[in-house]
Design a protein with these regions (language model features):
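Acidic-basic catalytic patches of nuclease active cores, encompassing PD-(D/E)XK
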Residues: 1-29, 119-133
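Short, conserved, surface-exposed binding loops centered on an aromatic residue
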Residues: 25-26, 33-37
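Short connector loops at helix/strand junctions that flank enzyme active sites
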Residues: 28-30, 40-42, 57, 73-74
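Conserved catalytic cores of phosphodiester-cleaving nucleases, focusing on short active-site segments
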Residues: 33-35, 42-50
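Active-site-adjacent loop/helix micro-motif of nuclease/hydrolase catalytic cores
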Residues: 51-61
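Amphipathic alpha-helical interface segments used for dimerization/assembly
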Residues: 65-66
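Nucleic-acid nuclease catalytic cores
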Residues: 69-98
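Helix-rich interaction surfaces within compact, conserved domain-sized segments
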Residues: 91-133
């Protein structure tokens, strides 16, 4: 991160809404990390505290992002990882977080992890599997 202090600044969604009459329930969401591997592979991370569920709307957004990447001819994976850092003044390091579930462009459904892998291990495995460059 180029500016860690700026990273601690919240982007607030209050007051943000779409003005179309049929979209009053559309809410903004965030993504914790996104890696684009040379416009061929998209890796998206969502980190949750101690097994907290990913909200339904956020899951839908991740699914659509992966589906859109697939439609554009890319391999893509959304990875939900868990952390146990309760102190909000303490940083959370993505590389060592344990992956809980994934949504891939190959399967287009959420699947729990079959074996224990860190975020870094899973991202590297996915790139090794699908990157041909």
């Amino acid at each position: 991160m180029k500016n860690p202090k700026r990273g601690k600044q919240l982007l607030r969604f209050e007051g943000f809404g779409l003005d179309h009459k049929n979209l009053e329930t559309v809410l903004a969401t965030d993504i914790d990390a996104l890696i684009d591997v040379r416009d061929r592979i998209l890796i998206v991370f969502e980190a949750k505290l101690d097994g907290k569920e990913v909200p339904k709307g956020q899951k839908y957004a991740l699914q659509r992002l992966i589906g859109n990447a697939k439609a554009a001819g890319k391999h893509a994976i959304a990875i939900v990882v868990d952390h146990d850092v309760y102190d909000m003044d303490e940083d959370v390091y993505l590389a060592g977080l344990i992956a809980r579930e994934v949504f891939t462009s190959e399967d287009m459904c959420w699947k729990p992890m079959k074996r224990k892998m860190t975020a870094r291990e899973l991202a590297n495995w996915y790139v090794d599997r699908y990157f041909d460059g």
